[in-house]
Amino acid sequence: MTKVLEVIYGFGYGGIRAFIMNYLNFLDKDKFKVDIYVFGYESSPFTDKVKELGANIFFEPENNAAKKPWLFVKQLEKFMKGHGPYDVVHANTNLISAWVLLAAKRANVPVRLAHSHSASHFGESWKQNLYSYLRRFMIDRLATKKLACGQLAGETMYGKNAKFEIIANGISLDRFMYRNEKRIEELKHKFNIPNGAKIYANVTRMDPQKNHLFAIEVFREIHKIDPKAIFLYGGVTPKISPTVEVVKAKIAEYGLTDYCRYTGPVMDVEQLYHMTDLWIYCSAYEGLPFGPIELQAASIPVIASDVITDEIDLGLGLVHFLSLNDNPKKWAELAVCIQKKQIPSDIIIKAFQKYNFDIRQGVKKLEAIYEGN
């Protein structure tokens, strides 16, 4: 049996956690035993689910990767030697992967995988750029294989001429295509949604990256056109994040409190998708986000910022791109014109298979990589 260690910062409601859980659901349990090492947090709402899927999850509350990388490497190496031996270490930690892979090398792990999940730029000052270069150099030397969620994410982390393999953010279509009318009505009641109101949403991690303030500017313009419209926002909040209070203050400043709903984390986000009419996905940067992919499986339209890779568009006519340089009024005018429509399930399935976003396709590729192929 191949023993795999997944390394990740936090295990909340974000996309990297979703990636691990999605693949964990479909990995061959007779061939692979998975442990998950979570640093920077001491718990997760998904602990029980991880255990149900036959995996173990371990927490290191300290996050020494940024300021004390030598201590981080020492702690992780000790863990690997104490809980291994591991055949595979899969670093889902962007540039922090340099330190994860160093620990894996010192622990004699034969298959060492770096995985880019983001297309963010990793530094602005010359010191930050130099530090990023050092970690990229280490990853290049220490990784036995480099992975990425998409072309843009791979080029951003490894370089345009680097060799890497794409592991798509595959999803289970059955989960997102299924519409549960009873649960949708429960959610409408929970969030006090008036009958007939058109629902717009940006329920993503409360982080500046997700650009909630711009989404509020867009909804402000939508409200001028459609005074009955409702806006949902929220999602998981990092330990230290002023974003929630800043967004709530802006909503109050614009007099929109009665028309905006803070959801907090939502476990069955697929039914929240089905409840809504359109999503405003105005991130400042992304790798290849799960949200727009999942929304297309649910047949929900999306307006996305053009900094997001066009790899998210599966050709179903549901994704519309606008620039963050366009004024919010332009976003709002497009939003109110887009009508929700149900795409036939067979067409959705074909599109997901064509672009390799069906989890059953991706898991075969990942299993081969875990086996050293």
Question: Positions of the model-derived regions?
Answer:
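Glycosyltransferase donor-sugar binding loop
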Residues: 36-44, 171, 203, 230-245
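Donor nucleotide-sugar binding/catalytic pocket of nucleotide-sugar-dependent glycosyltransferases
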Residues: 141-182, 321
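Aromatic "clamp/platform" in nucleotide-sugar-dependent glycosyltransferases that forms part
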Residues: 265, 284
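Short His-centered aromatic/hydrophobic patch
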Residues: 91-97, 116
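Short hydrophobic beta-strand element within catalytic cores of glycosyltransferases
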Residues: 38, 301-306, 311
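A conserved mid-protein helix/loop that constitutes part of the nucleotide-sugar donor-binding site
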Residues: 14-22, 198, 202-221, 245
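Acidic anion/phosphate-binding donor-loop and adjacent secondary structure
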Residues: 64-71, 155-158, 170-190, 195-196, ...
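Nucleotide-activated donor-binding/catalytic signature segment of Leloir-type glycosyltransferases, i.e.
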Residues: 244-264
